[in-house]
Amino acid sequence: MSEEALGELSGYIKERLGDAIEEAKLAYGELTLSVPAASIISVLTFLRDDVQCQFVNLTDISGVDYPQRAKRFDVVYQLMSPRQNQRIRVKVQADEDTLVPSAVPVFVGAEWFERETYDMYGVLFSGHPDLRRILTDYGFEGHPLRKDFPLTGFVEVRYNDELKRVVYEPVQLRQEFRNFDFLSPWEGTDYVLPGDEKAKAN
């Protein structure tokens, strides 16, 4: 879709929804709307039902973690309008305590997307019919896609053939932890990385 058509759509949505749209941004041929959490249901309903929009497909809901922000999470809704041949992205900011209204009443397919976002990031959705983990184990501690989640996790899960059940154990690293220097992609490290001995010698 052309930038001009997206610009017209952005203007139309802002005119119709007013203060429910905090920001409408066009970048890289895509339109992104930033919306307060309290307005997400009315905005999604409008985008689905309005004749000029007809975004009837919710293709994904995902999370993004920005730990340096007060509202550290973005909940991102990806919508598609087959009739208009358009896509749009809607973003809501939340923190660990902010309840984001569930989109299930508007898009029934949102149920598992929201469960995944809860499981991976810990974002809470109010009014969700079954908000529980979907990808991790029931006893899993933490939310693995948060930036502050340890790379190794908290526990190791494996099947114990002697006990004939899954067991949880403290993490045991099979190799020594390696600290790679990624501060500058343009400058090399001061030390020789494993496997680079020949390259550094030349």
Swiss-Prot record:
<dbReference type="InterPro" id="IPR001268">
    <property type="entry name" value="NADH_UbQ_OxRdtase_30kDa_su"/>
</dbReference>
<protein>
    <recommendedName>
        <fullName>NADH-quinone oxidoreductase subunit C</fullName>
        <ecNumber>7.1.1.-</ecNumber>
    </recommendedName>
</protein>
<dbReference type="InterPro" id="IPR010218">
    <property type="entry name" value="NADH_DH_suC"/>
</dbReference>
<dbReference type="InterPro" id="IPR037232">
    <property type="entry name" value="NADH_quin_OxRdtase_su_C/D-like"/>
</dbReference>
<keyword id="KW-0830">Ubiquinone</keyword>
<keyword id="KW-0813">Transport</keyword>
<dbReference type="GO" id="GO:0008137">
    <property type="term" value="F:NADH dehydrogenase (ubiquinone) activity"/>
</dbReference>
<dbReference type="GO" id="GO:0050136">
    <property type="term" value="F:NADH:ubiquinone reductase (non-electrogenic) activity"/>
</dbReference>
<comment type="similarity">
    <text>Belongs to the complex I 30 kDa subunit family.</text>
</comment>
<keyword id="KW-1003">Cell membrane</keyword>
<dbReference type="GO" id="GO:0048038">
    <property type="term" value="F:quinone binding"/>
</dbReference>
<dbReference type="Pfam" id="PF00329">
    <property type="entry name" value="Complex1_30kDa"/>
</dbReference>
<comment type="subunit">
    <text>NDH-1 is composed of 14 different subunits. Subunits NuoB, C, D, E, F, and G constitute the peripheral sector of the complex.</text>
</comment>
<dbReference type="GO" id="GO:0005886">
    <property type="term" value="C:plasma membrane"/>
</dbReference>
<keyword id="KW-0472">Membrane</keyword>
<keyword id="KW-0874">Quinone</keyword>
<keyword id="KW-0520">NAD</keyword>
<keyword id="KW-0997">Cell inner membrane</keyword>
<comment type="function">
    <text>NDH-1 shuttles electrons from NADH, via FMN and iron-sulfur (Fe-S) centers, to quinones in the respiratory chain. The immediate electron acceptor for the enzyme in this species is believed to be ubiquinone. Couples the redox reaction to proton translocation (for every two electrons transferred, four hydrogen ions are translocated across the cytoplasmic membrane), and thus conserves the redox energy in a proton gradient.</text>
</comment>
<dbReference type="InterPro" id="IPR020396">
    <property type="entry name" value="NADH_UbQ_OxRdtase_CS"/>
</dbReference>
<keyword id="KW-1278">Translocase</keyword>
